[in-house]
Amino acid sequence: MNPDDGKEAATWQTGIMKSLYENLSEPAPLEDGALRVIPLGGLGEVGRNMNVLEYRGKLLVVDCGVLFPEETQPGVDLILPDFSWIEDRMDDVVGMVLTHGHEDHIGAVPYLLKLRGDIPIYG
């Protein structure tokens, strides 16, 4: 196996994600009483499960898991959800609900808690 294969795959994935994000506009303001669901990981993959529920300006995190790399990604230990959407809104997070104890649902919790260590956790 060529060690550069993993780097090329990671670079390709990063390029795809950047091109997707560049074409996204800001979400529309929520109507009063509306609920927004924001998937930050776990779509189209087994792992990295994380969703954020937004309601009346407050955020509830549901799961915060890791994705384990494939053989084509040497040197990568874990793949985390994309926290960038909530990094600037950590003060709006009212809690985190963990649905169960598998790594793909709880493995990234310590990394999120580095952004704000006093988030209440429910399970």
Model-derived regions: residue spans:
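N-terminal Rossmann-fold NAD(P) dinucleotide-binding loop
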Residues: 105
